UniProtKB/Swiss-Prot annotation:
Name of the protein in question: Uracil-DNA glycosylase
GO-annotated molecular function: uracil DNA N-glycosylase activity
Compartments, as annotated in UniProt: Cytoplasm
UniProt xrefs under Gene3D superfamilies: Uracil-DNA glycosylase-like domain
GO terms, biological process: base-excision repair, AP site formation via deaminated base removal
Annotated EC: 3.2.2.27
Length: 219
């Protein structure tokens, strides 16, 4: 049964729903009137790069980076040379768990290809306006995507970073999954619980326990 399921099949079914069509219409207007991130071609990059059959981890963020050139369609990832503070703190926490960690850029594409779904709860944002695309339909899309995963998979690692990520799964049954919940890596909240949590090692320990390939965070 699972072999027939894919993110492509999920997207095809979702795209026929009324809320999704309204969301796409709204986004057409937004892209026409404002600078919106990420680029349209990168909107669904998270589910394009990660294979449902080999999915291991779901990392849930809030909404994309709102400065020009930063957002690339993957939560926390960026193509810019200068790392946004949240990503810099994530890397600090990985280095805390793996002292030899030395990733030189913020492009997390290879995490996605290893089975890490990097999902923002809201997938778009206006330039310099965080939360500007709240309640236009993305929350429904993200919740439906997470439900699709938990109904068809077990032992998926969910890393929830921040209050909004926790709210994203509030009404979803994650009993058959492995959940890690910590503060957001932003400078304002990093130290609350994410810092020194060793969560990236804990994730790999869990994968190892389940006899699955560990994630190489350096890639």
């Amino acid at each position: 049964m699972e072999s027939k399921l894919s993110f492509e099949s999920f997207f095809y079914n979702e795209s026929k729903k009324a809320y999704f069509q309204k969301l796409m219409e709204k986004l057409d207007e937004e892209y026409e009137k404002y600078q919106v991130f990420p680029n349209k071609k990168d909107l669904f990059r998270a589910i394009e790069l990660t294979n449902f059959a080999t999915l291991k981890i779901v990392i849930i963020g809030q909404d994309p980076y709102h400065r020009k050139g930063q957002a690339d369609g993957l939560a926390f990832s960026t193509r810019t040379k200068i790392l946004p503070p949240s990503l810099r703190n994530l890397f600090l926490e990985i280095k805390n768990a793996y002292p030899n960690f030395s990733k030189e850029n913020g492009n997390l594409e290879n995490w996605a290809k290893q089975g890490v779904l990097l999902l923002n709860h809201v997938l778009t944002v206006r330039k310099s306006s965080p939360n500007s695309h709240k309640n236009i339909g993305w929350e429904v899309f993200s919740s439906n995507l997470i439900n699709f995963i938990v109904k068809n998979k077990v032992d998926i690692v969910f890393l929830l970073l921040g209050k909004k990520a926790k709210l994203a799964v509030k009404n979803i049954n994650l009993e058959k999954q492995k959940v890690f919940a910590y503060s957001h890596p932003s400078p304002f909240s990093f130290a609350k619980s994410l810092k020194n949590s060793m969560v990236f090692r804990k994730i790999n320990d869990f994968l190892k326990e389940k006899k699955r390939l560990e994630i190489n965070w350096n890639l």
